[in-house]
Protein backbone atom coordinates (compact mmCIF):
# COMPACT_ATOMS: atom_id res chain seq x y z
CA UNK A 1 0.00 0.00 0.00
CA UNK A 2 1.64 3.25 -1.10
CA UNK A 3 1.76 6.24 1.22
CA UNK A 4 -0.90 8.90 0.75
CA UNK A 5 -3.67 6.57 -0.47
CA UNK A 6 -6.70 5.50 1.58
CA UNK A 7 -7.97 2.04 2.25
CA UNK A 8 -10.68 0.72 4.52
CA UNK A 9 -10.27 -1.47 7.62
CA UNK A 10 -13.04 -3.29 9.46
CA UNK A 11 -13.10 -1.89 12.99
CA UNK A 12 -14.72 -4.24 15.50
CA UNK A 13 -12.45 -3.84 18.53
CA UNK A 14 -10.72 -0.63 19.64
CA UNK A 15 -8.18 -0.01 22.39
CA UNK A 16 -8.88 3.46 23.83
CA UNK A 17 -6.09 5.41 25.53
CA UNK A 18 -6.89 8.68 27.32
CA UNK A 19 -4.64 11.31 28.84
CA UNK A 20 -6.83 12.65 31.67
CA UNK A 21 -4.69 15.82 31.95
CA UNK A 22 -5.00 16.90 28.30
CA UNK A 23 -6.86 20.13 27.64
CA UNK A 24 -7.04 20.85 31.38
CA UNK A 25 -9.27 17.81 31.89
CA UNK A 26 -11.30 18.16 28.68
CA UNK A 27 -9.95 14.83 27.45
CA UNK A 28 -11.96 12.83 30.00
CA UNK A 29 -15.25 14.31 28.82
CA UNK A 30 -14.24 13.90 25.17
CA UNK A 31 -13.23 10.28 25.75
CA UNK A 32 -16.57 9.46 27.37
CA UNK A 33 -18.44 10.84 24.36
CA UNK A 34 -16.18 9.09 21.85
CA UNK A 35 -16.29 5.72 23.62
CA UNK A 36 -20.08 5.92 23.94
CA UNK A 37 -20.25 6.56 20.20
CA UNK A 38 -18.07 3.54 19.44
CA UNK A 39 -20.21 1.29 21.62
CA UNK A 40 -23.39 2.68 20.04
CA UNK A 41 -22.02 1.59 16.67
CA UNK A 42 -21.30 -1.91 17.93
CA UNK A 43 -17.57 -1.65 18.55
CA UNK A 44 -15.95 -3.46 21.50
CA UNK A 45 -13.79 -1.04 23.51
CA UNK A 46 -10.89 -1.78 25.85
CA UNK A 47 -10.15 1.33 27.93
CA UNK A 48 -6.67 2.31 29.17
CA UNK A 49 -5.70 5.18 31.45
CA UNK A 50 -2.03 5.21 32.42
CA UNK A 51 -0.71 6.75 35.61
CA UNK A 52 1.98 8.47 33.53
CA UNK A 53 3.32 8.35 29.97
CA UNK A 54 5.58 5.35 30.63
CA UNK A 55 2.79 3.42 32.34
CA UNK A 56 0.34 4.24 29.54
CA UNK A 57 2.83 3.08 26.90
CA UNK A 58 3.38 -0.21 28.75
CA UNK A 59 -0.36 -0.83 29.09
CA UNK A 60 -0.96 0.06 25.44
CA UNK A 61 1.78 -2.29 24.23
CA UNK A 62 0.26 -5.12 26.30
CA UNK A 63 -3.23 -4.44 24.93
CA UNK A 64 -1.96 -4.29 21.34
CA UNK A 65 -0.15 -7.60 21.82
CA UNK A 66 -3.48 -9.22 22.74
CA UNK A 67 -5.01 -8.03 19.47
CA UNK A 68 -6.99 -4.95 18.44
CA UNK A 69 -8.34 -3.51 15.20
CA UNK A 70 -7.30 0.05 16.07
CA UNK A 71 -5.96 2.26 18.83
CA UNK A 72 -7.92 5.43 19.66
CA UNK A 73 -6.21 8.13 21.70
CA UNK A 74 -7.98 11.06 23.33
CA UNK A 75 -5.91 14.10 24.22
CA UNK A 76 -3.31 16.34 22.67
CA UNK A 77 -0.15 15.79 20.67
CA UNK A 78 1.62 14.34 23.71
CA UNK A 79 -0.69 11.33 24.00
CA UNK A 80 -0.54 10.85 20.23
CA UNK A 81 3.26 10.83 20.45
CA UNK A 82 3.09 8.27 23.25
CA UNK A 83 0.99 5.96 21.08
CA UNK A 84 3.44 6.37 18.18
CA UNK A 85 6.17 4.74 20.27
CA UNK A 86 4.04 1.56 20.28
CA UNK A 87 2.38 1.69 16.85
CA UNK A 88 5.28 2.80 14.62
CA UNK A 89 6.09 0.11 12.10
CA UNK A 90 2.93 -1.92 12.81
CA UNK A 91 -0.22 -2.26 10.71
CA UNK A 92 -2.54 -1.24 13.58
CA UNK A 93 -4.32 2.03 12.70
CA UNK A 94 -4.27 5.06 14.99
CA UNK A 95 -7.43 7.09 15.58
CA UNK A 96 -7.32 10.50 17.26
CA UNK A 97 -9.97 12.24 19.37
CA UNK A 98 -8.51 15.76 19.70
CA UNK A 99 -8.73 17.19 23.22
CA UNK A 100 -5.45 19.00 23.81
CA UNK A 101 -4.22 22.56 23.48
CA UNK A 102 -2.23 22.06 20.26
CA UNK A 103 -3.89 19.27 18.26
CA UNK A 104 -1.39 19.55 15.40
CA UNK A 105 -1.73 15.88 14.42
CA UNK A 106 -5.51 16.26 14.21
CA UNK A 107 -5.20 19.44 12.15
CA UNK A 108 -2.88 17.72 9.67
CA UNK A 109 -5.39 14.97 8.94
CA UNK A 110 -8.56 17.05 8.82
CA UNK A 111 -10.06 15.71 12.04
CA UNK A 112 -12.81 17.63 13.89
CA UNK A 113 -11.23 19.29 16.93
CA UNK A 114 -14.43 20.21 18.78
CA UNK A 115 -16.68 17.22 18.12
CA UNK A 116 -15.52 13.98 19.81
CA UNK A 117 -18.45 11.95 18.49
CA UNK A 118 -17.71 12.98 14.90
CA UNK A 119 -14.06 12.08 15.44
CA UNK A 120 -15.15 8.71 16.83
CA UNK A 121 -17.23 8.09 13.69
CA UNK A 122 -14.03 8.51 11.66
CA UNK A 123 -12.43 5.75 13.74
CA UNK A 124 -15.32 3.35 13.17
CA UNK A 125 -15.58 4.17 9.46
CA UNK A 126 -12.10 2.69 9.16
CA UNK A 127 -10.50 4.74 6.37
CA UNK A 128 -6.72 4.83 6.82
CA UNK A 129 -3.81 6.60 5.18
CA UNK A 130 -0.27 5.24 5.28
CA UNK A 131 2.03 8.05 6.42
CA UNK A 132 5.66 8.70 7.25
CA UNK A 133 6.94 9.28 10.76
CA UNK A 134 10.00 11.07 12.05
CA UNK A 135 12.55 9.20 14.13
CA UNK A 136 15.18 10.66 16.46
CA UNK A 137 18.19 8.62 17.53
CA UNK A 138 20.43 10.03 20.24
CA UNK A 139 24.13 9.42 20.87
CA UNK A 140 23.30 6.29 22.88
CA UNK A 141 21.19 4.77 20.10
CA UNK A 142 17.89 5.40 21.92
CA UNK A 143 15.05 6.09 19.48
CA UNK A 144 11.98 8.30 19.72
CA UNK A 145 9.28 8.53 17.05
CA UNK A 146 7.42 11.73 16.21
CA UNK A 147 4.54 12.68 13.95
CA UNK A 148 4.79 16.45 13.49
CA UNK A 149 7.94 18.52 14.01
CA UNK A 150 11.28 18.11 15.80
CA UNK A 151 12.49 21.49 17.06
CA UNK A 152 15.99 22.65 18.01
CA UNK A 153 17.40 26.06 18.86
CA UNK A 154 15.36 29.02 20.07
CA UNK A 155 12.06 27.15 20.33
CA UNK A 156 13.66 24.27 22.25
CA UNK A 157 15.27 26.79 24.63
CA UNK A 158 11.80 28.27 25.20
CA UNK A 159 10.50 24.78 26.02
CA UNK A 160 13.42 24.18 28.39
CA UNK A 161 12.65 27.39 30.26
CA UNK A 162 8.88 26.81 30.32
CA UNK A 163 9.42 23.33 31.78
CA UNK A 164 11.49 24.83 34.60
CA UNK A 165 8.75 27.34 35.46
CA UNK A 166 6.14 26.56 38.12
CA UNK A 167 3.88 29.49 37.23
CA UNK A 168 1.84 30.51 35.33
CA UNK A 169 0.03 27.59 33.71
CA UNK A 170 -1.07 27.08 30.12
CA UNK A 171 0.05 29.10 27.13
CA UNK A 172 0.99 32.15 29.22
CA UNK A 173 3.93 30.17 30.61
CA UNK A 174 5.31 29.77 27.08
CA UNK A 175 4.82 33.44 26.21
CA UNK A 176 6.76 34.48 29.32
CA UNK A 177 9.46 31.90 28.58
CA UNK A 178 9.69 33.23 25.01
CA UNK A 179 10.17 36.81 26.20
CA UNK A 180 12.86 35.67 28.64
CA UNK A 181 14.74 33.79 25.90
CA UNK A 182 14.42 36.76 23.53
CA UNK A 183 16.33 38.83 26.08
CA UNK A 184 19.15 36.25 25.89
CA UNK A 185 19.04 35.80 22.11
CA UNK A 186 22.34 34.69 20.63
CA UNK A 187 23.52 32.86 17.51
CA UNK A 188 23.78 29.10 18.04
CA UNK A 189 26.62 27.18 16.34
CA UNK A 190 24.88 24.40 14.38
CA UNK A 191 26.39 21.65 12.27
CA UNK A 192 23.99 19.67 10.07
CA UNK A 193 24.91 16.81 7.75
CA UNK A 194 22.15 16.02 5.23
CA UNK A 195 21.92 12.43 3.96
CA UNK A 196 25.57 11.87 4.84
CA UNK A 197 26.81 14.15 2.06
CA UNK A 198 25.87 17.84 2.41
CA UNK A 199 27.29 19.70 5.40
CA UNK A 200 25.82 22.94 6.75
CA UNK A 201 27.86 24.79 9.38
CA UNK A 202 26.15 28.01 10.43
CA UNK A 203 25.13 30.21 13.33
CA UNK A 204 21.36 29.70 13.48
CA UNK A 205 18.51 30.89 15.65
CA UNK A 206 16.59 27.67 15.10
CA UNK A 207 16.54 24.53 12.98
CA UNK A 208 13.25 22.61 12.77
CA UNK A 209 12.54 19.31 11.03
CA UNK A 210 8.98 18.70 9.84
CA UNK A 211 7.25 15.47 8.94
CA UNK A 212 4.09 17.60 8.89
CA UNK A 213 3.51 21.32 8.54
CA UNK A 214 2.69 22.70 11.97
CA UNK A 215 3.61 22.68 15.63
CA UNK A 216 2.62 24.69 18.68
CA UNK A 217 -1.10 24.70 17.85
CA UNK A 218 -1.07 25.65 14.18
CA UNK A 219 2.25 27.43 13.63
CA UNK A 220 3.17 26.52 10.03
CA UNK A 221 6.90 26.24 10.66
CA UNK A 222 7.35 23.80 7.72
CA UNK A 223 4.49 24.95 5.46
CA UNK A 224 5.39 22.74 2.49
CA UNK A 225 5.96 19.50 4.42
CA UNK A 226 4.31 16.39 2.99
CA UNK A 227 3.65 13.53 5.42
CA UNK A 228 3.96 10.91 2.68
CA UNK A 229 7.01 12.00 0.63
CA UNK A 230 9.68 10.15 2.63
CA UNK A 231 11.50 13.40 3.46
CA UNK A 232 11.84 15.89 6.30
CA UNK A 233 11.25 19.56 5.53
CA UNK A 234 13.97 21.58 7.24
CA UNK A 235 13.43 25.22 8.25
CA UNK A 236 16.46 27.23 9.40
CA UNK A 237 16.38 30.81 10.69
CA UNK A 238 19.39 33.10 11.12
CA UNK A 239 18.75 36.23 13.15
CA UNK A 240 20.76 37.84 15.92
CA UNK A 241 18.26 40.72 16.01
CA UNK A 242 15.39 40.56 18.49
CA UNK A 243 13.38 42.93 16.30
CA UNK A 244 13.72 40.69 13.23
CA UNK A 245 12.85 37.60 15.26
CA UNK A 246 9.74 39.30 16.66
CA UNK A 247 8.71 40.21 13.10
CA UNK A 248 9.24 36.60 12.03
CA UNK A 249 6.80 35.02 14.52
CA UNK A 250 3.52 36.47 13.13
CA UNK A 251 4.45 35.26 9.63
CA UNK A 252 4.72 31.65 10.86
CA UNK A 253 0.93 31.46 11.36
CA UNK A 254 0.51 31.51 7.56
CA UNK A 255 3.84 29.95 6.66
CA UNK A 256 5.01 33.18 5.04
CA UNK A 257 8.29 33.24 6.99
CA UNK A 258 9.91 30.97 4.39
CA UNK A 259 9.95 33.96 2.01
CA UNK A 260 12.10 36.05 4.38
CA UNK A 261 15.82 36.53 3.73
CA UNK A 262 16.79 35.23 7.16
CA UNK A 263 14.94 31.92 6.65
CA UNK A 264 16.16 29.06 4.46
CA UNK A 265 14.60 25.67 3.75
CA UNK A 266 15.70 22.34 2.36
CA UNK A 267 14.72 18.66 2.46
CA UNK A 268 16.49 15.47 3.46
CA UNK A 269 15.74 11.92 4.49
CA UNK A 270 18.26 11.88 7.34
CA UNK A 271 19.99 14.74 9.17
CA UNK A 272 22.81 14.55 11.71
CA UNK A 273 22.39 17.57 14.00
CA UNK A 274 24.94 19.06 16.39
CA UNK A 275 24.73 22.15 18.61
CA UNK A 276 26.31 22.31 22.09
CA UNK A 277 23.86 22.60 24.98
CA UNK A 278 20.72 22.35 22.83
CA UNK A 279 17.93 19.79 23.28
CA UNK A 280 15.51 18.33 20.73
CA UNK A 281 11.76 18.62 21.32
CA UNK A 282 9.37 16.59 19.18
CA UNK A 283 5.56 16.72 19.16
CA UNK A 284 6.00 19.31 21.91
CA UNK A 285 7.85 16.99 24.32
CA UNK A 286 11.50 16.62 25.28
CA UNK A 287 13.25 14.03 23.10
CA UNK A 288 17.00 14.14 23.81
CA UNK A 289 20.07 16.39 23.88
CA UNK A 290 22.00 17.02 20.69
CA UNK A 291 23.88 15.53 18.89
CA UNK A 292 21.21 13.34 17.31
CA UNK A 293 20.17 11.84 14.01
CA UNK A 294 16.71 12.88 12.80
CA UNK A 295 15.17 10.84 9.98
CA UNK A 296 12.01 10.43 7.95
CA UNK A 297 10.77 6.84 7.94
CA UNK A 298 8.46 6.18 4.98
CA UNK A 299 5.13 4.38 5.43
CA UNK A 300 5.63 3.90 9.18
CA UNK A 301 2.03 4.40 10.42
CA UNK A 302 -1.61 3.83 9.48
CA UNK A 303 -3.73 6.80 10.58
CA UNK A 304 -7.54 6.89 10.58
CA UNK A 305 -8.85 9.99 8.82
CA UNK A 306 -11.92 11.26 6.94
CA UNK A 307 -12.43 9.61 3.57
CA UNK A 308 -12.93 12.99 1.92
CA UNK A 309 -11.19 16.26 2.71
UniProtKB/Swiss-Prot annotation:
InterPro entries: ATP-NAD_kinase_N, Diacylglycerol/lipid_kinase, Diacylglycerol_kinase_cat_dom, Lipid_Phosphate_FormReg, NAD/diacylglycerol_kinase_sf, YegS/DAGK_C. ATP binds at residues 19-23, 76-82, 101. It is found in: Secreted, Cell wall. Keywords: ATP-binding, Cell wall, Kinase, Lipid biosynthesis, Lipid metabolism, Magnesium, Metal-binding, Nucleotide-binding, Phospholipid biosynthesis, Phospholipid metabolism, Secreted, Transferase. Its main location: secreted. It catalyses: a 1,2-diacyl-sn-glycerol + ATP = a 1,2-diacyl-sn-glycero-3-phosphate + ADP + H(+); N-hexadecanoylsphing-4-enine + ATP = N-(hexadecanoyl)-sphing-4-enine-1-phosphate + ADP + H(+). The active site is at residue 285. Gene3D superfamilies: 2.60.200.40, Probable inorganic polyphosphate/atp-NAD kinase, domain 1. This is Diacylglycerol kinase. It comes from Mycobacterium tuberculosis (strain CDC 1551 / Oshkosh).
Amino acid sequence: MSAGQLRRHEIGKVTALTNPLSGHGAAVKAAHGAIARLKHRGVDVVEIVGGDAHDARHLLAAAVAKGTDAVMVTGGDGVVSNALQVLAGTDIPLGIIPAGTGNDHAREFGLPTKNPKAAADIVVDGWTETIDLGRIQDDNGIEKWFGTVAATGFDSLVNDRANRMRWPHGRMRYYIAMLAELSRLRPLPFRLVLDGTEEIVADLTLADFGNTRSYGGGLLICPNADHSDGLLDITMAQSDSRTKLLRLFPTIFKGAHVELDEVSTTRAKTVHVECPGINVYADGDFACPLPAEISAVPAALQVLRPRHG
